[in-house]
Design a protein with these regions (language model features):
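A short beta-strand submotif of the Rossmann-like class I SAM-dependent methyltransferase core
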Residues: 37
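Short, solvent-exposed beta-strand-terminating loops
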Residues: 27, 40-48, 142
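Substrate-binding cleft of extracellular glycoside hydrolase catalytic domains
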Residues: 62-74, 95-96
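Active-site regions of metal-assisted phosphoester/phosphodiester hydrolases
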Residues: 1-34, 58, 80-81, 85-209
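Short, flexible/disordered intra-domain loops and linkers
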Residues: 13-15, 44-68
Length: 209
């Protein structure tokens, strides 16, 4: 089974369109069963997306419509144009750089049968840059969560509190994978990475070595 996760910095990256093309070509060649993306942006002031690519599953509680430059929608369409079809979902968590709807996306080769909108931070203010959410999707009786966590030493929105919410919700599922940007270095002891492993979760990267 192939899983992939990437923080895309979409729309903000230099040479964004060229890098997006490279990424889509790579994904079309590798075709992982599931991949999760973070910082999946769209311009808040952009016009509505005219035609939503096939396979889209709206996430409950998401009141933000897809816009014309939505990164996840672009990836879904570009993959479909290459004959590679994914089921996908997108969830914005906050306003980024005062102009982007910034969120996460999950793409699955198997049909998505359910989606979950999970608030991780104490803040539920869409305009606040520290607001954090997780997007969960169920495909083939397995749950996959795309996450973009806060920092360990953030006194206002600490990683540990967000992790407790995520671990409790995902851990209640029979089988779950967590994919994303945890903002935690694996070689730093007694912080986020050690907390995750100490909570009973396993690092699939290490298991695959």
């Amino acid at each position: 089974m192939k899983l992939l996760t990437l923080n895309t910095h979409s729309l903000t990256e230099p040479d964004y369109e060229a890098k997006r093309e490279i990424f889509v070509n790579f994904m079309a060649a590798e075709q992982p069963e599931v991949f999760a993306l973070q910082e999946v942006n769209q311009t808040a002031a952009a016009p509505l997306l005219g035609e939503i690519p096939a396979g889209y599953t709206p996430c409950p509680g998401n009141g933000v419509p897809l816009k014309a430059d939505n990164h996840a929608a672009a990836v879904a369409k570009m993959l479909a144009d290459r004959g590679v079809h994914y089921h996908w979902s997108w969830l914005p968590a906050k306003m980024g750089y005062d102009k982007y709807d910034e969120g996460m996306a999950v793409f699955s080769r198997a049909p998505i049968t359910a989606a979950e909108n999970l608030l991780l931070s104490k803040s539920d203010d869409y305009s606040y840059w520290k607001t954090r959410r997780a997007l969960g999707v169920c495909a083939g009786d397995v749950w996959y969560y795309a996450v973009h966590m806060g920092w360990w030493k953030d006194e206002e929105e600490p990683f540990a509190a967000q992790w407790e919410k995520l671990s409790r919700a995902a851990g209640a599922k029979s089988t779950a994978f967590l994919l994303g940007d945890f903002n935690s270095e694996a070689d730093v002891r007694r912080e986020g990475y050690d907390l995750i492993l100490g909570s009973g979760w396993q690092d699939t990267y290490r298991l695959a070595q």
